[in-house]
Swiss-Prot record:
Its cofactor is heme b; FAD; FMN; (6R)-L-erythro-5,6,7,8-tetrahydrobiopterin. Residues 33-65 have a biased composition (Pro residues). GO terms for cellular component: apical part of cell; caveola; cytoplasm; cytoskeleton; cytosol; Golgi apparatus; nucleus; plasma membrane. Binds 1 FAD. Binds 1 FMN. FAD binds at H797, R937, Y939, S940, T955, A957, Y961, V974, C975, S976. (6R)-L-erythro-5,6,7,8-tetrahydrobiopterin binds at S101, A445, W446, F459. This is Nitric oxide synthase 3. Keywords: Calcium, Calmodulin-binding, Cell membrane, Cytoplasm, Cytoskeleton, FAD, Flavoprotein, FMN, Golgi apparatus, Heme, Iron, Lipoprotein, Membrane, Metal-binding, Myristate, NADP, Oxidoreductase, Palmitate, Phosphoprotein, Zinc. Its main location: membrane. Residues 15-27 have a biased composition (Gly residues). Belongs to the NOS family. Residues 519-702 form the Flavodoxin-like domain. The keyword Metal-binding applies.
């Protein structure tokens, strides 16, 4: 990461490669040769290796102010540093003196001021920072930007200071590292983990935060960059300060002869620790305790728990005697005495850490004469001639010491980077910054490492040194001068007191970390199941984190850059698309750019559909950046989401060709953008074991997050606890409260479904099938009253909110053990335990349902017909009085295969489950809190507003079937049965959901092929009505369309036959073909058969030669078979491979010329679904045994035929 210098005690103590933050953070301690003046440096000898041909071109800035001209003498490239014009502070140099080689220029030290900062000065700095922040999130000039500026200005005027929001603090800390001119490792600036400790009040709390920081950053040797920010400086109050220059340092003991045992750089802080009660050792590598100071209090001494401090014994790969020298060094370089400045606010305690560059240890810490000074000892052991410098004994010994450091750290699996890799990464960082910001502040004297100077590329690079804000700044030691207020020596603490402090800190570590590690849980849901899972995940993560659960459409994607942990639970809608409330999130995620896909090659700008919904599933870009990611290291750019840890769970059905496609897309994009995946993608198949899959994934995700953030020592127990039925719902934690008069139905439906509802009324309901048919398909005509919210275009969907059947509701009410009065509106209240710093314990209303009677809830808001989930069965098992029923319910809830077979065979409603298990009690609060919501039913609109203004038509198949192989009870479709019984004037709650990807092309001259068997013809009725309007009212002559329809029998269910023939005669259709699957005396034919046998040439011509469109509407099985057929047609007619044809369809989808409107499983798909379920069971059982990871990409997508 960057090279860090520790500062504050004497010039020169090197700090490891920590964050490489601050002004003195690199591999140089004393001054190197001053950097040549830009554009005036002497020409070095010609390079021995040819200049790379990828050097950036010379680009002159626009006319105006003169900018520094910066040359790379190795390759000859020239750039102009325009960013330097934004420098916030003059450097230490004067017109007559260059002070660039001073380690601590007084002018650059931040000192406490007497009294508050001048208001105008602070306001100027605050405005500049707020502007930087909103520019970074691409919201500059927005209403939120202007409002935030006003808030800050008002706060500064009223109080003399202001508070940063957490996202602003994260941005500011990262920018401070990015702006640090002496840091060589800044390419990783975006990966800095920021811990907000601004709520800290005491030195004891400081120590707890610091212990957590060390534990997180050390990460068992896989070091992670981090910063912990303590409260800011306030006028008239002392500061929070860490007296140690680094969190981990070795003591230096002054001997009687004047020599030092240990690290000479730390003699002063060692003596201060002894004065404050520390009992010293006498070793060369004794870890110092910490001296921590709260405002206006004397410093307190804290000993670091030994298990927190990771150390590396040093040995050499070939010099066996090297290990006998007894050398060691600590893993974590953590600078702790620099000041963080953000927007004029100063944070005097903000320890930050990263990892070492090997030369910091091997050259500076071990070889400097004023440090451990082992150079000559090693040279003697190597039998080198130390009598003359011409033998280069110092250089030879230094190289071997550096080899030993690298070898030892790598052997111990502790993060470290060599100086060649670090400086090469800095050159890449310079290039990145030149493109992004027009320059990069850099101090040549500190960037060039203390070994191999001209062998590194930075030696030949001119640099411009200037100072931007936010920044890390030097500050005086707290025990010196004006900073020493309140630093009096306190009495020595006894060993018992010190030990107790460590014990208390250890017990608080997890609590404090949990309080500050925030987790964002995002869900995208069509039916509410993903939302339910997200809420369960929130309850689980509350055991060790500070979680919030948000719908995707409530979340600003730019916030991802400032998140530490994000969990995503999302469904996939239709043909692999995002759910409606995830569409904006998906679009914003696709627009973001990442470290591995930032080049402007066209294939890297593929849309969501072509990248994640293509038929061939081939995406060379994914394999390309994954390869780069595997090859990446700590010297590569971190990407926009460098600090993000994430995991994703997808809900879907393997009956669909793009199973969990949106979840895979989110998982892929988050990794592409630089995020770190904590757990492989989890996938839950609604056809089998979805809840079990989620439960296993959630527990694994929780454990992985706890390990990553060093919290939740009892993670496994907490996960088991949250999913225990006895823990997840307790009778005594819920109660019903009487409410005032409840709202009308439409506002309540709006509350439940989070979208505005409208009321249409029935004009007519007409059966479209023959009276001889045993089935029914109805044409429903609705009067919209010309409401603006019910305006639509042909191809859009209408969502209808049906009630449950009254008989079913009454039967269920009779089973409730404690029903409230039937006419009394009630609400559920839950007893919340409360939490430290949060609201106190008390009864809190459950916001899921509005106030309503129990009958209204069961009628309009709760799903009582879907089979109960395993989780609900587990709850019911705890309420069963008969032990046999309790055992059976528990077995069903725990055995995924048994549950799925039971659900598939019986498809039981809640009432049927209660009839099967009659001893189960049914409390009213359980019904109101645990039953899923009754979801809207979606239908394609079957009309055109131009033909029927103020009306919406629906084509609905009325569903009725018997379970248990035809021998069970008769089940009815909730919405279709209800609508079939409606009369003229009856109200219908509904809303419009646009389908912009399923609309006729704006150019009516483009040819179109429409494929829709059964009720799949519904949207096409709106298409032909719209085209008839174009022909007869507008006088247009659009290209005739081709319709491919399918039904069972020409005499029973040939829907809209007369309308279609009329439209054909009037020029809407050029061809109309019908496939009959059960027509007496005719072979069984499906729509895909007609495409293959009758329309192959036309399909190829329309799609590949004439820029035409193809529309497919129907159930998933039919749509998949049509897709396969079209793919084979394109391969055959276009003389291409099948995979190439798949890629062509992917392009057609991306261009919105291949359109699909797919609805769910139908009874016709039972055979196909059974086969998919069997395969899914096998996969899930392997997963539960650990044979496959929690995330799996299916080897092939199932594409069942019809």
């Amino acid at each position: 990461m960057g090279n860090l210098k520790s500062v504050g005690q004497e010039p020169g103590p090197p700090c490891g490669l920590g964050l490489g933050l601050g002004l003195g953070l690199c591999g140089k301690q004393g001054p190197a040769s001053p950097a040549p003046e830009p554009s005036q440096a002497p020409v070095p000898p010609s390079p021995t290796r040819p200049a790379p041909d990828h050097s950036p071109p010379l680009t002159r800035p626009p006319d105006g102010p003169k900018f520094p001209r910066v040359k790379n003498w190795e390759v000859g490239s020239i750039t102009y540093d325009t960013l330097s014009a934004q420098a916030q502070q003059d450097g230490p140099c004067t017109p007559r003196r260059c002070l660039g080689s001073l380690v601590f220029p007084r002018k650059l030290q931040s000192r406490p001021t007497q009294g508050p900062s001048p208001t105008e000065q602070l306001l100027g700095q605050a405005r500049d920072f707020i502007n930087q922040y909103y520019n970074s999130i691409k919201r500059s000039g927005s209403q939120a930007h202007e409002q935030r500026l006003q808030e800050v200005e008002a706060e500064v005027v009223a109080t003399g200071t202001y508070q940063l929001r957490e996202s602003e603090l994260v941005f500011g800390a990262k920018q401070a590292w990015r702006n640090a001119p002496r840091c060589v490792g800044r390419i990783q600036w975006g990966k800095l983990q920021v811990f907000d400790a601004r709520d800290c009040r005491t030195a004891q709390e400081m120590f707890t935060y610091i212990c957590n920081h060390i534990k997180y950053a050390t990460n068992r040797g896989n070091l992670r960059s981090a910063i912990t920010v303590f409260p800011q400086r306030y006028a008239g109050r002392g500061d929070f300060r860490i007296w140690n220059s680094q969190l981990v340092r070795y003591a230096g003991y002054r001997q009687q002869d004047g020599s030092v045992r240990g690290d000479p750089a730390n003699v002063e802080i060692t003596e201060l620790c002894i004065q404050h009660g520390w009992t010293p050792g006498n070793g060369r590598f004794d870890v110092l305790p910490l001296l921590l100071q709260a405002p206006d209090e004397p410093p307190e001494l804290f000993t670091l728990p030994p298990e927190l401090v990771l150390e590396v014994p040093l040995e050499h790969p070939t010099l066996e005697w090297f290990a006998a020298l007894g050398l060691r060094w600590y893993a974590l370089p953590a600078v702790s005495n620099m000041l963080l400045e953000i927007g004029g606010l100063e944070f005097p305690a903000a320890p930050f850490s990263g990892w070492y560059m090997s030369s910091e240890i091997g050259m500076r810490d071990l070889c400097d004469p004023h440090r451990y000074n082992i150079l000559e000892d090693v040279a003697v052991c190597m039998d080198l001639d130390t009598r003359t410098t011409s033998s280069l004994w110092k250089d030879k010994a230094a190289v071997e010491i550096n080899v030993a450091v690298l070898y030892s750290y790598q052997l111990a699996k502790v993060t470290i980077v060599d100086h060649h890799a670090a400086t090469a990464s800095f050159m890449k960082h310079l290039e990145n910054e030149q493109k992004a910001r027009g320059g990069c502040p850099a101090d040549w004297a500190w960037i060039v490492p203390p070994i191999s100077g001209s062998l590194t590329p930075v030696f030949h690079q001119e640099m411009v040194n200037y100072f931007l804000s936010p920044a890390f700044r030097y500050q005086p030691d707290p025990w010196k001068g004006s900073a020493a207020k309140g630093t009096g020596i306190t009495r020595k603490k006894t060993f018992k007191e010190v030990a107790n402090a460590v014990k208390i800190s250890a017990s608080l570590m997890g609590t404090v970390m949990a309080k500050r590690v925030k987790a964002t849980i995002l869900y995208g849901s069509e039916t509410g199941r993903a939302q339910s899972y997200a809420q369960q995940l929130g309850r689980l993560f509350r055991k060790a984190f500070d979680p919030r659960v948000l719908c995707m459409d409530e979340y600003d994607v730019v916030s991802l850059e400032h998140e530490a942990l994000v969990l995503v639970v999302t469904s996939t809608f239709g043909n692999g698309d995002p759910p409606e409330n995830g569409e904006s999130f998906a679009a914003a995620l696709m627009e973001m750019s990442g470290p591995y896909n930032s080049s402007p090659r066209p294939e890297q700008h593929k849309s969501y559909k072509i990248r994640f919904n293509s038929v061939s599933c081939s995406d060379p870009l994914v394999s390309s950046w994954r390869r780069k990611r595997k090859e990446s290291s700590n010297t590569d750019s971190a990407g926009a989401l460098g600090t993000l840890r994430f995991c994703v769970f997808g809900l879907g059905s393997r009956a669909y060709p793009h199973f969990c496609a949106f979840a895979r897309a989110v998982d892929t994009r988050l990794e592409e953008l630089g995020g770190e995946r904590l757990l492989q993608l989890g996938q839950g198949d609604e056809l089998c074991g979805q809840e079990e899959a989620f439960r296993g994934w959630a527990q694994a995700a929780f454990q992985a997050a706890c390990e990553t953030f060093c919290v939740g020592e009892d993670a496994k127990a907490a996960a088991r606890d949250i999913f225990s039925p006895k823990r997840s719902w307790k009778r005594q934690r819920y109660r019903l409260s009487t409410q005032a008069e409840s709202l009308q139905l439409l506002p309540r439906l709006t509350h439940v479904h989070r979208r505005k509802m409208f009321q249409a009324t029935i004009l007519s309901v007409e059966n479209l099938q023959s009276s001889k048919s045993t089935r029914a398909t109805i044409l429903v005509r609705l009067d919209t009253g010309s409401q603006e919210g019910l305006q639509y275009q042909p191809g859009d969907h209408i969502g209808v909110c049906p009630p449950n059947r009254p008989g079913l509701v009454e039967a269920l009410l009779s089973r409730v053990e404690d029903p409230p009065p039937s006419t009394e509106p009630v609400a559920v209240e839950q007893l919340e335990k409360g939490s430290p710093g949060g609201p106190p314990p008390g009864w809190v209303r459950d916001p899921r349902l509005p106030p309503c009677t129990l009958r209204q809830a069961l009628t309009y808001f709760l799903d009582i017909t879907s089979p109960p989930s395993p989780r609900l069965l587990r709850l019911l098992s705890t309420l069963a009085e008969e032990s046999s029923e309790q055992q059976e319910l528990e077995a069903l809830s725990q055995d995924p295969r048994r549950y799925e077979e039971w659900k598939w065979f019986r498809c039981p409603t809640l009432l049927e489950v209660l009839e099967q298990f009659p001893s189960v009690a049914l409390p009213a609060p359980l019904i109101l809190t645990q039953l899923p919501l009754l979801q809207p039913r979606y239908y394609s609109v079957s009309s055109a507003p131009s033909a029927h203004p103020g009306e919406i038509h629906l084509t609905v198949a009325v569903l009725a079937y018997r379970t248990q192989d035809g021998l069970g009870p008769l089940h009815y479709g909730v919405c279709s049965t209800w609508m079939s019984q409606l009369k003229a004037g009856d109200p219908v709650p509904c809303f419009i959901r646009g389908a912009p990807s399923f609309r006729l092309p704006p150019d009516p001259n483009l040819p179109c092929i429409l494929v829709g068997p059964g009720t799949g013809i519904a949207p096409f009725r709106g298409f032909w009505q719209d085209r008839l309007h174009d022909i007869e009212i507008k006088g247009l002559q659009p290209a005739p369309m081709t319709l491919v329809f399918g039904c069972r029998c020409s005499q029973l269910d040939h829907l809209y036959r007369d309308e279609v023939l009329d439209a054909q005669q009037r020029g809407v259709f050029g061809q109309v073909l019908t496939a009959f699957s059960r027509d007496p005396g005719s072979p069984k034919t499906y729509v895909q058969d007609l495409l293959r046998t009758e329309l192959a040439a036309e399909v190829h011509r329309v799609l590949c030669l004439e820029q035409g469109h193809m529309f497919v509407c129907g159930d998933v099985t039919m749509a998949t078979s049509v897709l396969q057929t079209v793919q084979r047609i394109l391969a055959t007619e276009g003389s291409m491979e099948l995979d190439e044809a798949g890629d062509v369809i992917g392009v057609l989808r991306d261009q919105q010329r291949y359109h699909e409107d797919i609805f769910g499983l139908t009874l016709r798909t039972q055979e196909v679904t059974s086969r998919i379920r069997t395969q899914s069971f096998s996969l899930q059982e392997r997963q539960l045994r650990g044979a496959v990871p929690w995330s799996f990409d299916p080897p092939t997508q199932e594409t069942p035929g019809s």
